């Protein structure tokens, strides 16, 4: 088979034209599209990488924030526990202090009640002792002589300072003296009383006489505003007061 040169040349020209046409209408657009797709893929990859980095940064921030929050929570919890422990200790201390105060007040009140009861019992015991002694004395010495008691009263009057004796003399001059004895005095006893009173306070002193069995024995001189006593009732009363006072002083000591 013979090959014509012009045919070959025409075929070559056709091939070149086809290549040019394919290059212009197919290859270049395909390459351009590939480049665009490649660029878009690169952009997407870069954007994804940026997003991954941003996500990592956000995650790191979240981890840091979580760690900070946990640290703050631990600090707040520790502070709350410390405050709660301190407040609890303060409450315990206050409760102990209040309890001690209540106990102290209770002990004080109990001690005061006990002292009052003891004082009341001592007073009753002293009063009972004095009453018993008075009854025994009244039964043992009926009608005891008044002269020794009157002599002691006169001795006390004599021992008074002059201003006080003048005051008593003025009261006697104005209102007289009432002489009270445990039993009624006979005329001799009254005469003895008049003699002693007139000697001490003046001859013009008015005297009246009375009797009071509760004196047990002794005498009382009643002036207008003053009473001078020397009797067993007065003595027993002073003994009772001394007994009670002695018990109080002994208890306080």
Curated annotation (Swiss-Prot):
Cellular component annotations (GO), alphabetically ordered: plasma membrane; proton-transporting ATP synthase complex
Subcellular location: Cell inner membrane
UniProt membrane topology term: Single-pass membrane protein
Annotated TM spans: 5-27
Keywords: ATP synthesis, Cell inner membrane, Cell membrane, CF(0), Hydrogen ion transport, Ion transport, Membrane, Transmembrane, Transmembrane helix, Transport
Domain of life of the native organism: Bacteria
GO molecular function, one term: proton-transporting ATPase activity, rotational mechanism
Description of how the protein assembles with itself and partners: F-type ATPases have 2 components, F(1) - the catalytic core - and F(0) - the membrane proton channel. F(1) has five subunits: alpha(3), beta(3), gamma(1), delta(1), epsilon(1). F(0) has three main subunits: a(1), b(2) and c(10-14). The alpha and beta chains form an alternating ring which encloses part of the gamma chain. F(1) is attached to F(0) by a central stalk formed by the gamma and epsilon chains, while a peripheral stalk is formed by the delta and b chains.
Family, as annotated: Belongs to the ATPase B chain family.
Function text: F(1)F(0) ATP synthase produces ATP from ADP in the presence of a proton or sodium gradient. F-type ATPases consist of two structural domains, F(1) containing the extramembraneous catalytic core and F(0) containing the membrane proton channel, linked together by a central stalk and a peripheral stalk. During catalysis, ATP synthesis in the catalytic domain of F(1) is coupled via a rotary mechanism of the central stalk subunits to proton translocation. Component of the F(0) channel, it forms part of the peripheral stalk, linking F(1) to F(0).
Protein name in UniProt: ATP synthase subunit b 1
Natural source organism: Rhodospirillum centenum (strain ATCC 51521 / SW)
């Amino acid at each position: 088979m013979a090959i014509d040169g012009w045919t070959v040349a025409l075929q070559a020209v056709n091939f070149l034209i086809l290549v040019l046409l394919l290059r212009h209408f197919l290859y270049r657009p395909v390459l351009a599209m590939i480049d665009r797709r490649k660029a878009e893929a690169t952009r997407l990859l870069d954007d994804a990488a940026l997003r991954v980095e941003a996500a990592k940064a956000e995650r790191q921030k979240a981890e840091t924030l979580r760690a900070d929050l946990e640290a703050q929570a631990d600090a707040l919890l520790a502070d709350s526990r410390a405050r709660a422990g301190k407040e609890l200790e303060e409450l315990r201390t206050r409760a102990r202090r209040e309890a001690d105060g209540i106990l102290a007040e209770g002990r004080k009140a109990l001690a005061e009640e006990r002292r009052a009861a003891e004082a009341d019992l001592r007073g009753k015991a002293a009063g009972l002792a004095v009453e018993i002694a008075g009854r025994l004395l009244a039964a043992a010495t009926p009608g005891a002589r008044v002269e020794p008691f009157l002599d002691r009263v006169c001795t006390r009057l004599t021992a008074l300072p002059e201003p006080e004796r003048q005051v008593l003399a003025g009261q006697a001059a104005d209102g007289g003296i009432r002489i009270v004895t445990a039993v009624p005095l006979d005329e001799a006893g009254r005469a003895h009383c008049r003699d002693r009173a007139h000697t001490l306070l003046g001859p013009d002193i008015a005297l009246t006489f009375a009797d009071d069995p509760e004196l047990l024995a002794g005498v009382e001189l009643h002036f207008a505003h003053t009473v001078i006593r020397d009797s067993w009732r007065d003595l027993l009363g002073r003994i009772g007061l001394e007994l009670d006072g002695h018990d109080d002083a002994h208890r306080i000591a």
